[in-house]
Regions:
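Alpha-helical transmembrane segments of multi-pass inner-membrane proteins
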Residues: 2-20, 24-43, 50-64, 104-124, ...
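Transmembrane alpha-helix boundary signature
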Residues: 65-97, 113-131, 137-142, 148, ...
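Peri-membrane helix termini and adjoining interfacial loops of integral membrane proteins
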Residues: 74-84, 125-138, 227-241, 326, ...
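Interfacial helix-loop-helix linkers and transmembrane-helix boundary segments
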Residues: 94-99, 197-200
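Extracytoplasmic loop-helix module adjacent to an early transmembrane segment
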Residues: 128-136, 374-393
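Soluble non-cytosolic domains of exported or imported proteins
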Residues: 158-161, 377-380, 401
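TM-adjacent membrane-interface loops and short helices in multi-pass inner/ER membrane proteins
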Residues: 251, 380-419, 426-429, 433-440
């Protein structure tokens, strides 16, 4: 929260117009990124990755312009996270403003960590010659064993950082319709958003969920068609058989990870919309239908880890929603009949998702579940080969993004499997970042999870927040045995959910 202070430069009408242009451009660009990211084959190719990078940098520039107008020229646009007239910043030690500043500092520290690792590189790997070219480096600073891959990692995550902070700043801004009551009443309005959520957040969640539902439908049709062409267009270099891929993702587990991140968000969003609208309008049930399709997709994809995570979130999410429905006071405008129907719809959602998954995926998934122990044994052998890397470079690691090239030095023979990803993001992060970089990541995630308990911000409905936490927890659990955080579209969605959480508070 910015403190009121005399502006350094006078505010002009053109500045206000420029601010609104930047806000509108941020919204449109963000919507493009939400749709583009998964459909562009999961953003796994250089052309799609750099499209997202440039879009992220553009969001960063737009954010810098907005912060400049607010900070240097004293512009105070109506925002849901701004204190009302006569109200000071929230009291207490744990405030949203302090956590936001701490997370901003951690973001800069992480980017600096990666940048120093690339600039202070100890080696560059030449793929044409399969050899390392070693350089002098400062040993007590982070350093990379493949400068090229670490630079790629830096540019990608600079774009993600810009996107994250642009979304954090854009979401609590008020739309024109939300600003009008402020103008009419001279600012004396409630700071609680209509329909329980601000309009921009509702718009973002609608787009995420409907886009995810369409993505899921395409993936199901593609699996039934069985040609092995991603989006019916391209045959990937790896996983060319239809059962190994799903939708635009060449690896079925990545598709499952994306859907398991998104469908709990849709379910929580539907619950909030149902509570606010009841049965006066029925359009919000499209959110439930899209979430149902997405919840079935991890099972249909035949990803073993994805199916287990789906089942876990379904059980925990349903138990939580039903329990809180009966334990806490109902919505004042909700009748007992409407409450019962809502619970019936929730239970029906779970049963329908499992039935849909069973109908289209169980026949292929069952043999893979019976071989789960064998699959884990194979991965544990790779983990055992990789663990000495973490032991040899415990503090700074081998450098962000360098696992692929450094792992070859630890293979027992040329016959040893040489993976591009370790299929264990927890261990790979420990190897490439060391405990120093890993601590920064853990602190940043901790700040996001603590944000809801801090004072100040947008009212965050308890049920929606818990389902967002479950979505993040499911992705983190799956990361123990796979590589969701090596896929840009999944990481982008993970950060979008974190940006939403960074605006929520149980005590605005």
């Amino acid at each position: 929260m910015m403190k009121d202070r005399p502006p350094r430069y006078p505010l002009r009408a053109g500045d206000v117009q420029l601010y609104h242009v930047c806000e509108d451009a941020t919204g449109w660009l963000l919507q493009f990124m939400v749709v583009f990211s998964p459909w562009a084959f999961g953003t796994t190719q250089p052309w799609s990755l750099w499209t997202m990078n440039v879009a992220g940098y553009t969001l960063g520039v737009l954010l810098a312009v907005k912060l400049g107008i607010r900070g240097l020229k004293g512009h105070r646009p109506p925002r849901w996270d701004a204190p009302g007239p006569g109200r000071s910043s929230p009291p207490g030690q744990l405030t949203g403003a302090r956590l936001t500043k701490a997370l901003a500092a951690l973001s800069l520290a992480l980017l600096a960590y990666v940048w120093i690792s690339a600039v202070n590189a100890h080696a560059t790997y030449h793929r044409d010659a399969l050899s390392f070219e070693y350089h002098d480096c400062i040993a007590w600073l982070p350093h990379s064993f493949d400068s090229a891959l670490t630079w790629n990692f830096f540019w990608a995550h600079l774009g993600l950082a810009c996107s994250f902070w642009a979304v954090c700043d854009w979401l609590p801004g008020k739309t024109g319709d939300e600003e009008r009551p402020v103008m009419v009443s001279g600012g004396a309005v409630s700071d609680r958003a209509p329909d329980l959520l601000p309009a921009r957040l509702r718009r973002l969640l609608w787009l995420l969920v409907i886009n995810g539902g369409l993505l899921g439908l395409e993936g199901i049709v593609q699996r039934l068609e069985g040609s092995g062409l991603l989006l019916f267009l391209v045959q990937p270099r790896i996983n060319q058989d239809a059962v190994s891929q799903f939708g635009p993702y060449a690896y079925r587990a990545n598709a499952a990870q994306y859907f398991n991140l998104l469908w709990p968000v849709g379910l929580g969003f539907w619950w909030i919309l149902q509570r606010a609208r009841g049965f006066r309008r029925h359009t919000h049930h499209w959110v439930l239908a899209s979430s149902l399709v997405m919840a079935a997709c991890p099972i249909i994809s035949t990803s073993r880890g994805g199916a287990v995570i789906t089942l876990g979130i379904l059980v925990l999410g349903t138990v939580f929603l039903v329990a809180t429905h009966f334990l806490f006071a109902p919505n004042p405008g909700e009748s007992k009949r409407a409450g019962r129907v809502k619970v019936v719809l929730l239970v029906g959602f779970c049963l329908a998702a499992l039935a849909l998954g069973y109908a289209f995926g169980w026949k292929s998934l069952l043999p893979r579940l019976s071989q789960m122990e064998e699959g884990f044994e194979g991965r544990e052998e790779t983990y055992a080969t990789a663990r000495p890397m973490a032991e040899d470079y415990p503090v700074f690691g081998t450098g962000p993004g360098t696992f692929e090239t450094v792992f070859q030095l630890y293979r027992i023979s040329t016959d040893t499997y040489w993976p591009v990803q370790l299929h264990n993001d927890w261990l790979e992060t420990r190897i490439t970042f060391g405990w120093a970089g890993g601590a920064l990541i853990a602190l940043a995630l901790g700040a996001v999870l603590l944000r809801w308990f801090a004072r100040g911000g947008v009212h965050g409905p308890r049920r929606l927040v818990v389902l967002l936490w479950l979505a993040l927890a499911g992705c983190l659990a799956h990361a123990r045995y796979d590589f969701p955080f090596q896929i840009h579209s999944i990481e982008f969605l993970f950060l979008l959910i974190c940006a939403v959480l960074m605006n929520f508070s149980r005590r605005p």
